Amino acid sequence: MDQPAPAPEPMLLDAQPPAAVACDKKQQEGEAPYAEGNDAVTGHIISTTIGGKNGEPKRTISYMAERVVGTGSFGIVFQAKCLETGETVAIKKVLQDRRYKNRELQLMRAMDHPNVISLKHCFFSTTSRDELFLNLVMEYVPETLYRVLKHYSNANHRMPLIYVKLYMYQLFRGLAYIHTVPGVCHRDVKPQNVLVDPLTHQVKLCDFGSAKTLVPGEPNISYICSRYYRAPELIFGATEYTTSIDIWSAGCVLAELLLGQPLFPGESAVDQLVEIIKVLGTPTREEIRCMNPNYTEFRFPQIKAHPWHKVFHKRMPPEAIDLASRLLQYSPSLRCTALDACAHPFFDELREPNARLPNGRPFPPLFNFKHELANSSQELISRLIPEHVRRQATHNFFNTGS
């Protein structure tokens, strides 16, 4: 089983959260209010106050906790219904140390992208034991990539390639956004943290409990990320890693969707490295230096790389194999970026003018890029946004008189 990632490094809390200050996406600097109806479990009603800033009226909003949908060392996630609107939401309830800011909350407030889970608002609650909990109210997405893959595996089927392309493309798009705009490294990319809407097939990256803004030269903990998806530099104990650890994890997810099972199913940290070496071969001294300079004198058994085309079944498209090989490189700097992955020929089918879901419905939005393209070359942008989409955008621009 995957090992749980440790609690992220704390952030100092500037002050205790006052009871009457609202916390929604428009109030970036506000603290969260407190809620009535504590110890929330299934069937309980939680009421809190939102608004009250920038001329907005305060209003009470109540949630009925319906069922627990996730548990972990962090706390619980439960599905809830807003009694005022009938909207279904997900509420992540985490124990809050009063001395520190919650990093997940700070990061989620800064993010806004179609392929990243969105924060609606948040509030604090307390228990009879005077424990303080932070409740993050998020949009509800019913499925995870893990459960979707399990559905196919249980039926002894492989996931259809069109869905592999659709889900992975959107995952890379979400990663491209968090890596470039807020500059965040997720640090726990895995199928369980990729949400899927079964009707629209829109994908959203979730669970930013391990995420962090990486600062060059500033050390980070290496014991991060669930084991099967852990980049080799983390296994080597590197502390000055980059967002390329997410790219490795995404490569592992791609391989898992193609194979129907994890590519590197290590039973321990050391065994994880053995599983990687069995496929990629023994890393060279230069590759080891790129991962962690302290290990260059360490002697590894010499094992030849297993050819990628033999890792996957014979009918696997060469574009899929090529993309996996570009993601799963020992040297972090040699892994392609998330945007480069989006532009890879493996995803060309998604860019065809008449491409649709197998049921005939349109794809979810795939080309509504945000600020992540700001520093991209014109050549990359032209590969990312197909001509028919650019033509339509130009047509709409002139027709609206903008």
Curated annotation (Swiss-Prot):
GO cellular component: cytoplasm; nucleus
GO molecular function: ATP binding; protein kinase activity; protein serine kinase activity; protein serine/threonine kinase activity
Subunit structure: Interacts with DLT. Interacts with OFP8. Interacts with GRF4. Interacts with PUB24. Interacts with SMOS1.
Additional observations: Plants over-expressing GSK2 display typical brassinosteroid (BR) loss-of-function phenotypes, and plants silencing GSK2 have enhanced BR signaling phenotypes.
Tissue expression from the record: Expressed in lamina joints, vascular tissue and nodes.
Compartments in which it is found: Cytoplasm; Nucleus
Modification comment: Autophosphorylated.
Protein name, as recorded: Shaggy-related protein kinase GSK2
Function, in words: Serine-threonine kinase that acts as a negative regulator of brassinosteroid (BR) signaling. Phosphorylates DLT and BZR1, two positive regulators that mediates several BR responses. Phosphorylation of DLT and BZR1 inhibits their activities in BR signaling. Phosphorylates OFP8, a positive regulator of BR responses. Phosphorylated OFP8 shuttles from the nucleus to the cytoplasm where it is degraded by the proteasome. Phosphorylates the E3 ubiquitin-protein ligase PUB24, a negative regulator of BR signaling, which targets BZR1 and promotes its degradation via the 26S proteasome.
Recorded catalytic activity of this chain's protein: L-seryl-[protein] + ATP = O-phospho-L-seryl-[protein] + ADP + H(+); L-threonyl-[protein] + ATP = O-phospho-L-threonyl-[protein] + ADP + H(+)
Domain Protein kinase: 63-347
Its EC number(s): 2.7.11.1
Positions bound to ATP: 69-77, 92
GO biological process: brassinosteroid mediated signaling pathway; cell differentiation; negative regulation of brassinosteroid mediated signaling pathway
Outcome (variant: residue 284 to I): Gain-of-function mutant
Species name: Oryza sativa subsp. japonica (Rice)
